[in-house]
Amino acid sequence: MNKKTIWITGGSTGIGKALALKFANEGWNVAISARRENLLKEIADTNANISPFPLDVTDKTKCKQVFEEIKNKFENIDICFFSTGTWNPKKEKDIDIGQMEEVFKVNFFGTVNSIKAVEEYFLSLIHI
């Protein structure tokens, strides 16, 4: 039986990292993506089931390229968990519109880019 595979974005910290370690410890192939390649490598070094795939989710083309790399390595992808996010908490009077645009670029559009990268693959798996 083939090992199951999960792709996790935002896999270098927080919920993404915790899920990566949990799935890897349960024997899954885990592809983790995030911007900070050094953190991805540190996590991958802790468990042979974890493979790093550096990615900035704000880059639509790169999202598709990385998903292709993951498919080529593991053949099948069972779950995608998109937990990429950024936040810089501030008092209302200190909020800068440029910073808020960056938050939306990563948190919203980055998730949309990730979904669009896998959409065709998962739709091809649907059988009625």
Residue ranges and their predicted role:
Residues 55-65, 97:
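The beta1-alpha1 cofactor-binding region of Rossmann-like NAD(H)/NADP(H)-dependent oxidoreductases
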Residues 126-128:
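Conserved small/polar residues in nucleotide/adenosyl-binding loops
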